[in-house]
Every structure is written in structure tokens, then in C-alpha cells.
């Protein structure tokens, strides 16, 4: 959407200003979120007004004024056009989700990875989603295949939205929303229960690896996400495999690895799918 953003704004920004737009915008339901470089923050109102006029399905435009940060993985947003409301409905692959784009973590840029994971799940699996947010990965997996998913999140807003999304999608009993620290929840309730564990907190995966292993059955699978620096895009997956093997202390078999998305110049979010043998 970077090219689309530049095209939409070409009549309200100078050519020099237009070239400074370095990021695409995200549309989540009827909300647009745009990142604006510091050099163009003074133009944020006209940018918001123009986006609202040009994108017919949008009712709100927000400027993202901080990165995603903190234990709750939230960001600061400032309304620059339209309605000042951060909750919306988002649809993906047959599921409906209520999301709050400021109070709970959510990214539309992970839809391909969500679809991939849902396609891997087998009938009857028990899954632990350690940093599950509003339940996107969890509900899509359960909608696709009969399974049980424990969706853990530290953020009480995310956990409550997950409960609402379970009701909306008629998946009560298949997706269980648990509010708390993933390590504590696993150690107290879920030791050795999971056929599959999702670790969707790439910047802190090393810290939580032992907890993921505690929740896993013998021959279970971990989806281990990380951020990797690579001069060549095609090298990032292999580097992530090497990194996992350097921090893992168990008998592990790499199934596959892949780039999920770029997150910065020569930085990539990657995932390694690993089978763990405990015995």
C-alpha cells in the first residue's frame, strides 16, 4: 500500500514531501492507521482528510504517534480525520473479530501466516497460543479444524475481546481465553498439554522458550518467531534456524523456516517450525 498512499496524497503534498512517505497505511475494518515521518507531521490533518475522502470504506483515520511497545504491545494513536473511536470489526477468512486498535495488539499484516498455521492444525489438537491477543490465530485455527486452543494474553482488554470474539464466531469450548502471564499460566495449568505452541512475540521468544517447552507434549511442535537481521532476504530463514538451535537445549528437529514479513531495512520477522522430542 505504500504506492497507493503516495498516489492518494500526490495532489496534496509536493513531490519532495511525497517521496518522504516511507510506510504503507493499514486499514482495519473502517479504521485507517498511518505512520507519518517527523518531517511531515505538520501535514497530518490534510493527510488524514485526504485519506478519509479517498478510501470510501473508512470512517476514521489515526496517526500512529508511537511504536508498538510495553508488555501489552499497544501503541499511541491520534485521530486526524473522521470519528474518534478505536474499536472496529475486522473480517478474515470467514471469521469476524472485534478489535481495539489502540488498547490491544493487532496486525492485519499477519493474515498469510495466520492462514498457514490454520492449515497445519490437525483434528483434535490442543494448542497453546502464548501471546494470543484478541484471538486471531486461535479462532482461525479452531474455525478451520476441530481443536482446542488456549489463547493467553497479559492484556486484560485483549483477553476480554478474545472472549467476545469466541462468542461471535460460535467457538465456545474450542477457544479458551486466559488472561495472565504466559509462563505463569502454563506452569499452573497447562504443563505437557499442547500438541502445538505458538510464540508470537518475536522480540522476546528466547525469554519464553522454556515456558513453551513446558507446555508441550513429546513430539509436539513449536512455532518460534523471531526478528533476524540479514543482508539478503533469502538468508533470514536459515539464520533463524541457527539462532533457534543456539538457544534450544532439547532434542529438536527443524521442520521448516520462512520469512513472515519485513520489519525494517534488512530486518525480517521469521518463523521456525520445530518438532521437539522430550523422551
Predicted feature locations:
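SAM-dependent transferase fold signal centered on methyltransferase-like domains
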Residues: 1-279
Amino acid at each position: 500500500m505504500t504506492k497507493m498512499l503516495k498516489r492518494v496524497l500526490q495532489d496534496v503534498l509536493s513531490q519532495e514531501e511525497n517521496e518522504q512517505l516511507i510506510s504503507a497505511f493499514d486499514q482495519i475494518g473502517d479504521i485507517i492507521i498511518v505512520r507519518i515521518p517527523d518531517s511531515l507531521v505538520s501535514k497530518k490533518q490534510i493527510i488524514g482528510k485526504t485519506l478519509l475522502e479517498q478510501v470510501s470504506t473508512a470512517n476514521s483515520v489515526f496517526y500512529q504517534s508511537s511504536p508498538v511497545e510495553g508488555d501489552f504491545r499497544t501503541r499511541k494513536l491520534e485521530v486526524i480525520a473522521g470519528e474518534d473511536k478505536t474499536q472496529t470489526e475486522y473480517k478474515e477468512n470467514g471469521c469476524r473479530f472485534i478489535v481495539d486498535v489502540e488498547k490491544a495488539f493487532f496486525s492485519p499484516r499477519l493474515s498469510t501466516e495466520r492462514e498457514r498455521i490454520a492449515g497445519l492444525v490437525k483434528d483434535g489438537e490442543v494448542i497453546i497460543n502464548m501471546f494470543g491477543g484478541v484471538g486471531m490465530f486461535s479462532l482461525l485455527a479452531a474455525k478451520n479444524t476441530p481443536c482446542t486452543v488456549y489463547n493467553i494474553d497479559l492484556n486484560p482488554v485483549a483477553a476480554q475481546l478474545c472472549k467476545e470474539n469466541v462468542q461471535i464466531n460460535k467457538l465456545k469450548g474450542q477457544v479458551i481465553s486466559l488472561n495472565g502471564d504466559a509462563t505463569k499460566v502454563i506452569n499452573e495449568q497447562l504443563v505437557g498439554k499442547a500438541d502445538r505452541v505458538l510464540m508470537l512475540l518475536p522480540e522476546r521468544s528466547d525469554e519464553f522458550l522454556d515456558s513453551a517447552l513446558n507446555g508441550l507434549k513429546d513430539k509436539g511442535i513449536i512455532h518460534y518467531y523471531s526478528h533476524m537481521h540479514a543482508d539478503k532476504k533469502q538468508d533470514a530463514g536459515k539464520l533463524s534456524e541457527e539462532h533457534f538451535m543456539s538457544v534450544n537445549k532439547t532434542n529438536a528437529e527443524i521442520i521448516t523456516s520462512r520469512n513472515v514479513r519485513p520489519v525494517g531495512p534488512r530486518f525480517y520477522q521469521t518463523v521456525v517450525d520445530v518438532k521437539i522430542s522430550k523422551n
